[in-house]
Amino acid sequence: MSIIRNILLSAALFLFLSPANVNALSDAYKDNIYDAGPLKPVDSVLKVKPGQVAPDFTLKSLTGQKVTLSQYRGKKNVVLSFIPAAWTPVCSDQWPGYNIVKDLFDEHDAVLLGISVDSLPTLHSWTNQMGKLWFPVLSDFFPHGEVAAKFGILRSDGTAEGAIIIIDKQGLIRYIDVHDINRRPPLDSIVRELQKLRQG
């Protein structure tokens, strides 16, 4: 069974990391992507570290529901995926890629929360163009970037870093990856950290 799971995981990783993900997007969608060119890779100072309790927050989702981080305490591992901005090349490729690995999150008893400093109308338009996402998309628009600032990943230009933060069922931060804003975070790191949580 584990051999089959590893084969499926390898296939999912290949698909997720493949440039074909971008090419599969419609031309109309790609025409709306704003490319600012290379940006300063990291432009913030972390305020949290592994082993600490994650700062709690409540943000509104695209469905209009409010999502609070602590609502998952004792129930689910949480993966926070912070993106810098909607309608940008890396972000527009990253989130749709998670659609092909939903089972991976389910298997590791984890929920994915996508967070952006963009407004709800902007996120609504952007995610509608990219296609349905299975995870909640949350707006950290007002007070602007408040949640990103709590974690220390708000950049000087008002966008968030591209960051992955994994929080266990006890609410403790177990993994932080603030990656080069010009690159998509590696999925294999998320897989590895979720496997560690499952193994205890």
Task: Name each region found by the language model.
Residues 159-200:
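Thiol-/selenol-based redox modules, centered on thioredoxin-like
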Residues 92-133, 143-147:
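Structural microenvironment flanking redox-active thiols in thiol-disulfide oxidoreductases
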